[in-house]
């Protein structure tokens, strides 16, 4: 009986320990992800004008291609 009590107590201790380790890991991962997200967000804002210009250019190219394909069909 004492063996079962010890095993049960040890099992509870290990569950608690794993939960604490998981929370610690989660907190450290969240802190690293928040720092990476902040750096990525700053880079995204810096790249926004370039991305916007490229997107506009690509839209223009698609529109020109569409207009040309429409003219080809009419002829």
From Swiss-Prot:
GO molecular function: hormone activity
GO cellular component, one term: extracellular region
Gene3D superfamilies: 6.10.250.590
Cross-referenced InterPro entries: Glucagon, Glucagon_GIP_secretin_VIP
Compartments reported by the entry: Secreted
Record key words, sorted: Hormone, Secreted
Disulfide bonds: none
Main location: secreted
Signal peptide: none
One of the Pfam families matching this protein, by short name: Hormone_2
Family label: Belongs to the glucagon family.
Protein name listed in UniProt: Pro-glucagon
Organism from which the protein derives: Amia calva (Bowfin)
Gene, per the UniProt record: gcg
């Amino acid at each position: 009986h004492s063996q079962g009590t010890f095993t049960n107590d040890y099992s509870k201790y290990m569950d608690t320990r794993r939960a604490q380790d998981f929370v610690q890991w989660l907190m450290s991962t969240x802190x690293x992800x928040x720092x990476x997200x902040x750096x990525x967000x700053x880079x995204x804002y810096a790249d926004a004008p370039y991305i916007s210009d490229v997107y506009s250019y690509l839209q223009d190219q698609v529109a020109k291609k569409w207009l040309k394909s429409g003219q080809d069909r009419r002829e």
